[in-house]
Amino acid sequence: MRSRRDNSWVVQKFGGTSIGKFPDKVAEIVKSARLGGDRPAVICSARSSGKKVFGTTSRLLQVYRTLRGIVAITQDPDMQELLFDRLRSIIKDIRDDQVATVQIYILRQDIRDETTRQITADCQELLDYTSAAKRFNLDINGKAKDKMVSFGEKLSCRLMVAMLRDRDIPAEYVDLSDIVPNNNLNHLKPEFFPEAAAVFGKRIEACNGRVPVITGFFGAVPGSLIDSGIGRGYSDLCAVLVAIGLHAERVQIWKEVDGIFTADPREVPDARCLPSITPSEAAELTFYGSEVIHHLALSLAIQAKPPISIFVKNVQKPWGQGTVVVPSDGDDTSSWPIDYLDPSDSDCTSSTALPKMPTAVTIKRDITILNILSNKQSMSHGFFVKVFTILAEHDISVDLISTSEVHVSMAINSSNMDPSQIKDVHCKIAEEGEVNVLPDMAILSLVGAELKNMTGIAGRMFAILGEQHVNIEMISQGASEINISCVIPDKDATRALNMLHNELFTKNAM
């Protein structure tokens, strides 16, 4: 069994809420790692001190949307000025919030003053960019969105560098937002990731003993980081790319919970923390509603040589083991640092003595079902091509699909859609057949690598829901055989989640 090397890199990614609510705890975790013989590389998400909608990234997206509105109404300068005043106010709020945090947490006056100047300069740069876009009527596209959103991670890094320096830990600000050479490609290709990892590693190694504090936002990504297949959650991916570039074997994802749970503990009080989970299970949970780890981060971590172990840990309980993402039987485990997992030091429940059961149950809200009855006597490949082309034109992806001879049902995520999009899609698909739209739905998913070996588990799941009079609109079982999903009314989602967890997890563990 291999032991962990002293002075080896460990990549520590801290979520926006952790940095927003517990910056002192974050700094102490990094300091402890360094004093303990590790070489921490710190990835920062944009700060958020409460709900995500009020976080820095959400505010910056407000700036982006406001700027788009300004550029779109060049014929109305009075309205432009009104909107620009609103935009300027949002940026001022961001700046004031960041500076107030510096004043609270940084003890040394010289570091406070320097960090305040840096934050003010960053916010002025953002304001100057938006002013130039307004003046010269620039194209406010995905690249522009990336540029504006990247300031959130920059500001977080300014704070964390100051927090570490305030504790006599030498630290260096590392901006990855525009470090990858722009190859003018419009589409993200697989070779982008190893190239980016190499560039990241080279830049971070240049810190020469100082703790690198790294922007979780990275670029330039072909097309756009936000609007490409990466999207929100990119800082997880950044952490894994940094680990690959540094040949690190450990990534720690720090959150405000003990690890990954059998269900969302905010909705299911008796949910248990899992000591370990496979990458496939983690990816399914992420896709179907649980904010676990970005799916591309999981994929790249397992493909790395040696594979990278990912720990999900609680920033408020740094001594806890948390949940480790370990490879399944089909993965190459020859170089996996398995000795890092010590169940005796874990807040998470050991599953070694438990009967065979699913791994977790999750819910994904803001789902709309499209039921389409073909106006032909039988389906054809042309029908599906037309339907999916219409969805693609509106940037709509399908979460679940169920088909019969002349009928297709699709569950789509409508969280970022306005009613006009649904109406437009409805009208266009109606040319191909009869369309019925069911809003306010939710996907309920049972996830587990052992599901394929659990005879009758699907029947038991649906029987539990039926006994409690929960109507099922759609049923789907993934080709991977580790997920069984159904679509139910959103009003029944929390009740159904608790019923399934109680019957399949709590009672099973007694």
UniProtKB/Swiss-Prot annotation:
It is an enzyme of class 2 (transferase). GO terms for molecular function: aspartate kinase activity; ATP binding. Belongs to the aspartokinase family. It comes from Gibberella moniliformis (strain M3125 / FGSC 7600) (Maize ear and stalk rot fungus). Aspartate kinase; part of the gene cluster that mediates the biosynthesis of fusaric acid, a mycotoxin with low to moderate toxicity to animals and humans, but with high phytotoxic properties. L-aspartate is suggested as fusaric acid amino acid precursor that is activated and further processed to O-acetyl-L-homoserine by cluster enzymes aspartate kinase FUB3 and homoserine O-acetyltransferase FUB5, as well as enzymes of the primary metabolism. GO terms for cellular component: cytosol. This is Aspartate kinase FUB3. It catalyses: L-aspartate + ATP = 4-phospho-L-aspartate + ADP. Residues 372-440, 446-510 form the ACT domain. SUPFAM superfamilies: ACT-like, Carbamate kinase-like. Keywords: ATP-binding, Kinase, Nucleotide-binding, Phosphoprotein, Repeat, Transferase. Pathway: Mycotoxin biosynthesis. Fusaric acid is phytotoxic to plants such as cotton and banana. It has been shown to induce programmed cell death in plants. In addition to a mild toxicity to animals, fusaric acid exhibits acanthamoebicidal, antioomycete, and antimycobacterial activities. It comes from the Eukaryota. The lineage of its organism: Eukaryota, Fungi, Dikarya, Ascomycota, Pezizomycotina. Disruption phenotype: Strongly reduces production of fusaric acid. PROSITE patterns: ACT, ASPARTOKINASE. GO terms for biological process: homoserine biosynthetic process; lysine biosynthetic process via diaminopimelate. InterPro entries: AceGlu_kinase-like_sf (IPR036393), ACT-like_dom_sf (IPR045865), ACT_Aspartokinase (IPR054352), ACT_dom (IPR002912), Asp/Glu/Uridylate_kinase (IPR001048), Asp_kin_monofn (IPR005260), Asp_kinase (IPR001341), Aspartate_kinase_CS (IPR018042). Induction: Expression is positively regulated by the fusaric acid cluster specific transcription factor FUB10. Expression is also positively regulated by the secondary metabolism regulator LAE1. Its EC number is 2.7.2.4.
